[in-house]
């Protein structure tokens, strides 16, 4: 009964309570006031299913009691059963763990005191810093409602990306938008949603006027709604985490006593702040608010007084602090909703950490012991360096032989080389030793063709050299014993580089062999050695096909000199080096390029001879089969010359001494032992490996050299072990005692005393060359064969081994030298040719430093008599109206502009002028004209100043001061995140989807954002409105909600060709609004266009309309990918809900850049074509511009391409495996700058880059008339697609069609320029005769008929003259430079060259697409080779290949334009830039005998024409033929026309140079046009009148 009664009473009580609740109003607000104010409750617990009342209490406390609580330092603790059950029941303190078993007695653990439950953070105002507290309250300010004007200004400012205060309220929306109709329409649309109705033509009203009109008709609700939308973004994306709009309002209320209305005004101004990134702390946010509040007060004329503060002790808690008194670390961590099993797992993890710590301590003790015993030097000295990925191979001597030949011939033709020069003879010797059938073909062609041009004497010298080289090469290939060069025996080519006179000294050598247990002199071997040495001196080594392992070949070492002999001999050499680095590899690669003869190979690998593992790995690599990644060698020679210098007596032996002993003795033996094992396991009947052991006469005679003498003496024991151990069949030992070798790392400190030592002791000291030559003789048969039979000791120490008391002699000499140096004035030691200038007394020292000559580098005009007159056959044969020339070039790229890029491409370094331009581009310097600051003297100054310090920088100091920084932040390099919105490839961000397994903590969000969360997550989110309409809501994501969490991965494409760091379009003069709105790739194109016009000598684009109609200026600028940054914003930023301009879509289109070029610079109404040809875009653009002008549709056309680089595109290129894997390249020891290696054996993908390139095309008539510079003639340009396939990026051979023609086409009479010239003359004579006859008939009719007036006769006469001109044009079309277009049996390439009297043999060089991908480079060279072969290029006439992308990377749409610019610069300077990353040209390219791949830049005696090819994804193949401008000048009517053009050109160039220099100083190279060249009234008349031309700056009488 008792239980039933309790149940009945419970049901009744519940019913009554529910009835009471439903029947009576809830007075929770009053209840809270009673609890919080009257009762002063500071700890409340809510028991219920959710935290409803707790959340309401938090908001009430935050709004009404936060200041009260802060002043009294009384924090309130609010808890709910739903969220804080564990704390309420103190469950977090009941964590049990298994006690650790131990035999030791345990002391009793004192009972822990009860722990207080942690307080829950309450959203109160931030408390002051410790030591500060509120003392005086600010003055209350009268509040005002939200103003319509503020909402309008904020809306406009946010859309225009300007600050609130930058909006001129007297201007209209249309004026503020600057003619951007899309932006204007969007603003009107946004305002119409707020102000309904919006007055008609609101966009034309001033902001102030519009505000007054709409202020009375708009509800406050709409204004507050608009306010919420305007301010939400900045709090979501730019404020620190947890800092909400409520916090901002509370700060303004507490700190400044501002009401809601004025808070709204300040927040609207804050919404227009342009912050580069999210603020990190609340302090930064409040400082920003305070700054805006003060500015607002000044604007409104208010006197605001902030809250003052006085010292006070720090509060114990704050709104962002959780305190759990007395909890352990584990308990504190597990109190955050961590279950007991998870807590136990943490405890177990702690146990494992303790175990690991104990083991680490033990290991550390052992390491400390080893470090104490062995020392740091020894431990570091045994670390392995071996890395198979880093191994480099060099074997393309076939290409370097051709390079040497062409460098030599061009040097002779320029008069820079004499034939009796020893270096010239050495070069010739090396050419002979590397000769092959292909090289002899080249020599024969050069000898018989007109390629050798210039001074007759120099040409004769070059031909003599060629004749001798041909003879010697043929003899060499036929193994003739005596080869002669200019009457001299063919010498060892290294002799020319030797110091001293090799061979002039007597040879002192001692050779010992073992006989009856003792070592005795062997006179027969001494004679044999001398014979070998004579052979080496006369003809060098001959070890073709022999394999050699060499260690110790560092700079200035004997090994390095010996390596030269080995490479000349044709040996295959593996150099194992401990100083492996890009620099070391480059040194060795240059060594191979210079000395590697036919059949030779150089392999370079990282190796530490102090590491046992490296010794074993090295030998394993040598003997392993090629199929297994090894060399597959059976070694012939081992030369272990690695050595380490030492110092110290026996009581100073240290870690370094033991390391050196290990390197020079212990591991030499290990290395040989490993070789013995592999020889033993390999094939039988192989010759033993001949080992050249480096011995020393220093058996302690020098002293103070650590264990050096002991190490060398220990090696000698190996000669005896040959008899006592079982490896005689595998190793043959030759111990060689090496004497005093000057300049090596071991002996360089003794060089100063060497000469005196020779005088006093008779000991001979050697240069490195002399010693290497003597060592090389030991490798020559039959002496080397004797070593296989028995060990041999050879003493070539120059008598040093027999000298006693050498140390005391050295001490005496050093003491005497020191005494002489202290007693003799320094200048008396100088040789007689060194003169010390002393300033004259009273003569002031010059303070003038040289100035840089900043200029545009216009092409140099050729001399008429020497260069143009011989081509006079072309005179009158060309229709200049239909001839296309390039008059301007420019680019924006990783190396700045076209001028600075050319300096790096051609010379590998910047000039002073180049450094100044780059420093200006990167914002390192600015030009200043005015008084300096007081701290710098306050004087008047004009010149460069440092951009940061404002300190003056002289021109001459710029290179020294900034070049290192310029190089580091230009070109291909590690991606710099600041250049791409923080993109860091080492931390590429992706999003990972996660389903919540528990409820998250609540957070505040603006109402609109909270509703959006509800829209997405539905029942998986709780959203509780604030107490007022605009107050933040409380949002909590529930279990089951899906969220996206950022994650980062290491992206393996971290190198790129980015624009120079600091590049800014504003620096050129591009307006701020344009930079903010326009895509970056478009900014590249705008700047490049301005510079291309300037390089055309055009300082004002509107000048064009003085010479042509506005419809005759074309625009063909294209892009491979379009607006990548805009695409990123439209998709990624929109998805992330980041601020994005509303008209971003317009920047996505590929034709937008061309539109901006026209809108801001040209104002043309001519044809506009936008090519989208992926990587071939720029050359396709050239074709379009070429067609516009040849078709008469334009007289000027802009062509080129542009593309940006984004992480999204980079990632997708990587997925296609098109770009180089930079992680793998780094593992191979490559620097970022050498990761693009076109045409090399190790090429592995392109390096992406960004930028733009623009050319100005013009008809030849217009170029001559305007006096524009001419960089080249576009003789032809075309595109071709490929065959059926399934791969879009796959390279094809469609461009072979550019050489399509039938067999025997080269015999076509039309290809004979003299034949065509004769035909043109006859046709023109006939036309002239017809004209004269027609005019005579017209005169007769006029005389006979009175009905025909004089005016009519004049019109008829004019018609007849025009008809004659058109007939002449038709003749030139059929027989002039386009004669071939109507003859299908003549290929475009042949026709384009023949038009200017050139043949396929006159195509001097080709600029290759050369992306550094395996397939492209192989396919492209194959296509060019086939074209040249099909067109009948003469055998032995290779074309130079330019592969520019090694330097710039691949910029997609701009790539072809950069190539055109570089090729034009080569054409006009005669200098072919080399590919400095071409360390080893791929062997599969050797068969392309019409192509040559230079590493060094080659200065030629002049160039005639070139081909450029470009290939793009999507079956786009493009090619163009460009000819030197001198052929156009020859086509002019006479010399006078050329000289008139020269005068116009000089005037234009001076004007452009002046504008350029002023533009750099004033940052106005780009001047955006504000108005079209005609007035609004003139527009229709100008567009409709083809004869309309500007006069000066205006159109008149249109």
Curated annotation (Swiss-Prot):
Q: In which pathway does it act?
A: Mycotoxin biosynthesis
Q: Give the modified residues of type O-(pantetheine 4'-phosphoryl)serine.
A: 181
Q: Which residues form the Carrier domain?
A: 143-221
Q: Where is the composition biased (Low complexity)?
A: 104-115
UniProt biased composition (Polar residues): 820-829
Superkingdom of source: Eukaryota
Q: Where is the active site?
A: 1175, 1409, 1450
What this protein catalyses is:
acetyl-CoA + n malonyl-CoA + 2n NADPH + 4n H(+) = a long-chain-acyl-CoA + n CoA + n CO2 + 2n NADP(+); a fatty acyl-[ACP] + malonyl-[ACP] + H(+) = a 3-oxoacyl-[ACP] + holo-[ACP] + CO2; a (3R)-hydroxyacyl-[ACP] + NADP(+) = a 3-oxoacyl-[ACP] + NADPH + H(+)
User: Which residue stretches, if any, does this entry annotate as coiled coil?
Assistant: none
Q: Where is this region: Disordered?
A: 96-134, 818-844, 1280-1301
EC number(s): the record gives 2.3.1.86, 1.1.1.100, 2.3.1.41
The UniProt keyword set, sorted, is: Fatty acid biosynthesis, Fatty acid metabolism, Lipid biosynthesis, Lipid metabolism, Magnesium, Metal-binding, Multifunctional enzyme, NADP, Oxidoreductase, Phosphopantetheine, Phosphoprotein, Transferase
Instruction: Please list where the region (Ketoreductase (KR) domain) is annotated.
Output: 543-784
InterPro entries the UniProt entry points to? Acyl_Trfase/lysoPLipase, Fas_alpha_ACP, FAS_alpha_su_C, FAS_alpha_yeast, FASI_helical, Fungal_FAS, Ketoacyl_synth_AS, Ketoacyl_synth_C
Annotated GO CC locations: fatty acid synthase complex
Gene Ontology MF terms in the entry: 3-oxoacyl-[acyl-carrier-protein] reductase (NADPH) activity; 3-oxoacyl-[acyl-carrier-protein] synthase activity; fatty acid synthase activity; fatty-acyl-CoA synthase activity; holo-[acyl-carrier-protein] synthase activity; metal ion binding
One Pfam entry name: FAS_I_H
Q: Which GO terms describe its biological process?
A: long-chain fatty acid biosynthetic process
Q: Which residues form the Ketosynthase family 3 (KS3) domain?
A: 992-1524
Question: Is Nucleotide-binding set as a keyword in this record?
Answer: no
What's the subunit arrangement here? Answer: Fatty acid synthase is composed of alpha and beta subunits.
Explain the purpose of this protein.
Answer: Fatty acid synthase subunit alpha; part of the gene cluster that mediates the biosynthesis of gramillins A and B, bicyclic lipopeptides that induce cell death in maize leaves but not in wheat leaves. The nonribosomal peptide synthetase GRA1 incorporates respectively a glutamic adic (Glu), a leucine (Leu), a serine (Ser), a hydroxyglutamine (HOGln), a 2-amino decanoic acid, and 2 cysteins (CysB and CysA). The biosynthesis of 2-amino decanoic acid incorporated in gramillins could be initiated by a fatty acid synthase composed of the alpha and beta subunits FGSG_00036 and FGSG_11656.
Q: Which family does it belong to?
A: Belongs to the thiolase-like superfamily. Fungal fatty acid synthetase subunit alpha family.
Q: What protein name applies here?
A: Fatty acid synthase subunit alpha
Q: Which organism is it from?
A: Gibberella zeae (strain ATCC MYA-4620 / CBS 123657 / FGSC 9075 / NRRL 31084 / PH-1)
């Amino acid at each position: 009964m008792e239980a039933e009664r309790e149940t009945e009473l419970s049901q009744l009580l519940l019913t009554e309570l529910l009835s009471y609740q439903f029947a009576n109003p809830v007075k929770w607000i009053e209840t809270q006031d009673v609890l919080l104010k009257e009762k002063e409750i500071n700890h409340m617990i809510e028991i219920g299913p959710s935290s409803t009342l707790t959340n309401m209490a938090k908001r009430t406390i935050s709004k009404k009691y936060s200041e009260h609580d802060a002043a009294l330092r009384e924090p309130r603790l609010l808890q709910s059963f739903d969220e804080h059950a564990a704390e309420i029941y103190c469950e977090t303190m009941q964590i049990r763990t298994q006690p650790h078993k131990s035999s030791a007695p345990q002391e009793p653990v004192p009972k822990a005191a009860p722990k207080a439950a942690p307080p829950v953070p309450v959203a109160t105002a931030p408390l002051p810093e410790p030591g500060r507290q509120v003392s005086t309250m600010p003055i209350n300010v009268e509040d005002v409602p939200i103003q319509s004007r503020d909402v309008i200004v904020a809306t406009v400012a946010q859309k225009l990306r300007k600050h609130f205060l930058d909006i001129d309220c007297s201007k209209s929306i249309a004026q503020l938008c600057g003619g951007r109709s899309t932006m204007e329409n969007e603003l009107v649309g946004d305002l119409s949603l707020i102000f309904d109705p919006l007055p008609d033509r609101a966009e034309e009203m001033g902001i102030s006027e519009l505000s007054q009109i709409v202020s009375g008709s708009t509800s406050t609700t709409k204004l507050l709604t608009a306010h919420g939308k305007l301010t939400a973004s900045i709090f979501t994306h730019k404020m620190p985490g947890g800092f909400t709009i409520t916090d901002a309002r509370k700060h303004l209320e507490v700190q400044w006593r501002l009401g809601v209305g004025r808070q709204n005004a300040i927040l609207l101004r804050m919404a227009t702040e342009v912050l580069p990134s999210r603020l990190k702390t609340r302090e930064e946010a409040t400082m920003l608010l305070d700054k805006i509040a003060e500015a607002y007060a000044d604007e409104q004329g208010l006197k605001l007084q902030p809250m003052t503060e006085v010292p006070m002790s720090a509060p114990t808690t704050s709104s962002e602090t959780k305190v759990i008194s007395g909890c352990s670390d584990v308990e504190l961590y597990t109190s955050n909703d961590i279950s007991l099993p998870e807590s136990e797992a943490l405890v177990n993890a702690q146990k494992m950490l303790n175990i690991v710590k104990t083991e680490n301590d033990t290991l550390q003790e052992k390491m400390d012991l080893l470090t104490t015993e062995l020392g740091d030097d020894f431990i570091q000295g045994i670390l392995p360096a071996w890395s198979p990925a880093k191994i480099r191979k060099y074997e393309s001597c076939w290409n370097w032989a051709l390079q040497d030949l062409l460098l030599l011939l061009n040097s002779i033709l320029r008069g820079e080389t004499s034939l009796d020069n020893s270096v010239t003879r050495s070069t010739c010797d090396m050419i002979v030793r590397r000769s092959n059938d292909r090289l002899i073909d080249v020599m024969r062609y050069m000898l018989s063709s007109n390629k050798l041009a210039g001074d007759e004497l120099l040409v004769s010298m070059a031909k003599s050299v060629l004749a001798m080289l041909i003879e010697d090469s043929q003899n060499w290939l036929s193994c003739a014993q005596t080869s002669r060069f200019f009457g001299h025996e063919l010498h060892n080519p290294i002799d020319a580089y030797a110091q001293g006179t090799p061979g002039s000294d007597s040879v002192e050598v001692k050779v010992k062999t073992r006989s009856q247990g003792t070592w005795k002199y062997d006179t027969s071997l001494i004679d044999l050695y001398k014979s070998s040495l004579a052979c080496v001196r006369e003809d060098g080594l001959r070890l073709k096909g022999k394999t050699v392992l060499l260690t110790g070949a560092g700079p200035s070492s004997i090994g390095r000199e010996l390596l030269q002999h080995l490479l000349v001999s044709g040996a295959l050499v593996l150099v194992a080096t401990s100083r492996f680095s890009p620099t070391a590899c480059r040194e060795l690669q240059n060594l191979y390029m210079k000395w590697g003869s036919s059949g030779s190979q150089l392999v370079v690998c990282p190796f530490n001879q102090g590491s046992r593992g490296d010794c074993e790995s090295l030998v394993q690599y040598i003997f392993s089969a090629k199929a297994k990644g090894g060399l597959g060698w059976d070694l012939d020679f081992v030369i272990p010359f690695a050595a380490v210098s030492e110092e110290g007596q026996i009581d100073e032996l240290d870690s370094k001494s033991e390391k050196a002993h290990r390197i020079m003795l212990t591991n030499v033996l290990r290395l040989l032992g490993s070789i013995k094992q592999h020889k033993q396991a390999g094939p039988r009947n192989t010759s033993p490996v001949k080992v050249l052991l480096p011995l020393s006469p220093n058996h302690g005679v020098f002293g103070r050299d650590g264990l050096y003498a002991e190490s060398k003496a220990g090696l000698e024991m190996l000669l005896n072990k040959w008899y006592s151990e079982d490896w005689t069949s595998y190793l043959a030992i030759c111990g060689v005692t090496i004497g005093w070798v000057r300049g090596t790392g071991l002996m360089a400190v003794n060089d100063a005393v060497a000469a005196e030592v020779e005088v006093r002791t008779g000991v001979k000291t050697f240069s490195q060359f002399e010693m290497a030559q003597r060592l090389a003789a030991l490798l020559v048969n039959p002496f080397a064969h004797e070593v296989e039979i028995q060990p041999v000791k050879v003493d070539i120490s120059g008598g040093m081994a027999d000298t006693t008391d050498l140390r005391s002699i050295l001490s005496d000499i050093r003491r005497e030298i020191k005494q002489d140096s202290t007693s003799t004035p320094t200048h008396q030691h100088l040789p007689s040719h060194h003169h010390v200038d002393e300033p004259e007394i009273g003569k002031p020292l010059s303070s003038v430093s040289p100035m840089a000559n900043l200029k545009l580098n216009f092409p140099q005009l050729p001399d008429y008599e020497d260069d143009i007159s011989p081509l006079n056959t072309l005179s009158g044969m060309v229709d200049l109206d239909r001839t296309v020339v390039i008059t301007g070039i420019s680019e924006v790229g990783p190396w700045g502009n076209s001028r600075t890029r050319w300096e790096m491409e051609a010379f590998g370094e910047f000039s002073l002028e180049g450094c100044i331009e780059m420093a200006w581009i990167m914002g390192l310097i600015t030009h200043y004209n005015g008084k300096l600051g007081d701290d710098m003297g306050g004087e008047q100054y004009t010149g460069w100043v440092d951009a940061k310090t404002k300190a003056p920088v002289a021109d001459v100091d710029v290179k020294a001061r900034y070049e290192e920084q310029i190089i580091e932040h230009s070109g291909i390099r590690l991606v710099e995140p600041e250049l791409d919105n923080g993109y860091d490839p080492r931390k590429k961000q992706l999003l990972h989807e996660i389903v919540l397994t528990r409820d998250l903590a609540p957070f505040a969000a603006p109402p609109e954002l909270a509703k959006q969360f509800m829209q997405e997550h539905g029942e998986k989110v709780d959203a509780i409105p604030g107490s007022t309409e605009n107050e933040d809501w409380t949002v909590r994501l529930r279990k089951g909600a899906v969220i996206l969490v950022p994650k980062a991965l290491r992206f393996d494409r971290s190198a790129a060709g980015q624009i120079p760091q600091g590049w800014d379009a504003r620096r050129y003069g591009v307006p701020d609004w344009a930079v903010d709105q326009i895509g970056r790739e478009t900014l590249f194109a705008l700047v490049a266009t301005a510079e291309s016009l300037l390089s055309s000598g055009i300082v004002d684009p509107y000048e064009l309309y003085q010479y042509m109609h506005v419809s005759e200026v074309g625009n063909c600028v294209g892009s491979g990918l379009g607006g990548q940054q805009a695409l990123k914003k439209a998709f990624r930023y929109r998805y992330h809900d980041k601020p994005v301009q509303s008209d971003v879509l317009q920047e996505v289109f590929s034709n937008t850049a061309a539109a901006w070029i026209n809108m801001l610079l040209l104002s043309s109404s001519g044809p506009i074509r936008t090519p989208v040809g992926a990587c071939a875009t720029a050359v396709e653009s050239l074709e379009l511009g070429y067609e516009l002008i040849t078709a008469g549709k334009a007289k000027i056309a802009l062509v080129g391409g542009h593309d940006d680089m984004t992480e999204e595109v980079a990632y997708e290129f990587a997925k296609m495996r098109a770009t180089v894997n930079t992680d793998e390249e780094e593992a191979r020891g490559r620097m970022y700058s050498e990761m693009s290696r076109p045409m090399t054996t190790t090429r592995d993908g392109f390096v992406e880059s960004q930028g733009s390139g623009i050319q100005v095309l013009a008809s030849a008539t217009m170029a001559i008339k305007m006096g524009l510079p001419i960089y080249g003639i576009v003789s032809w340009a075309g595109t071709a697609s490929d065959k059926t396939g399934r791969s879009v990026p796959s390279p094809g051979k469609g461009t072979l069609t550019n050489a399509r023609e039938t067999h025997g086409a080269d015999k076509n009479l039309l290809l004979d320029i003299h034949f065509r010239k004769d035909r043109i003359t006859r046709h023109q004579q006939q036309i002239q005769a017809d004209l004269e006859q027609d005019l005579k008939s017209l005169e007769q009719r006029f005389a006979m008929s009175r009905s025909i007036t004089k005016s009519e006769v004049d019109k008829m006469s004019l018609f007849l003259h025009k008809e004659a001109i058109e007939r002449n044009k038709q003749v030139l079309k059929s027989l002039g430079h386009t004669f071939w277009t109507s003859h299908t049996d003549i290929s475009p390439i042949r026709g384009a060259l023949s038009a200017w009297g050139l043949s396929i043999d006159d195509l001097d060089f080709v600029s290759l697409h050369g992306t550094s991908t395996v397939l492209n480079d192989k396919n492209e060279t194959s296509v060019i080779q086939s074209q040249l072969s099909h067109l009948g290029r003469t055998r032995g006439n290779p074309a130079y290949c330019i592969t520019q992308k090694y330097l710039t990377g691949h910029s997609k749409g701009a790539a072809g334009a950069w190539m055109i610019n570089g090729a034009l610069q080569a054409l006009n300077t005669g200098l072919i830039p080399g590919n400095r990353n071409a360390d080893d040209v791929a062997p599969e390219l050797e068969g392309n005998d019409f192509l040559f791949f230079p590493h060094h830049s080659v200065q030629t005696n002049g160039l005639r024409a070139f081909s450029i090819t470009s290939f793009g994804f999507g079956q786009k193949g493009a090619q163009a033929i460009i000819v030197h401008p001198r052929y156009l000048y020859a086509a002019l009517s006479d010399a006078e026309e050329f000289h008139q053009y020269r005068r116009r050109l000089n005037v234009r160039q001076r004007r452009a140079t002046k504008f350029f220099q002023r533009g750099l100083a004033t940052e106005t190279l780009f001047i955006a046009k504000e108005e079209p060249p005609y007035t609004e009234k003139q527009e229709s008349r100008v567009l409709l009148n083809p004869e309309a031309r500007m006069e000066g700056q205006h159109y008149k009488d249109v």
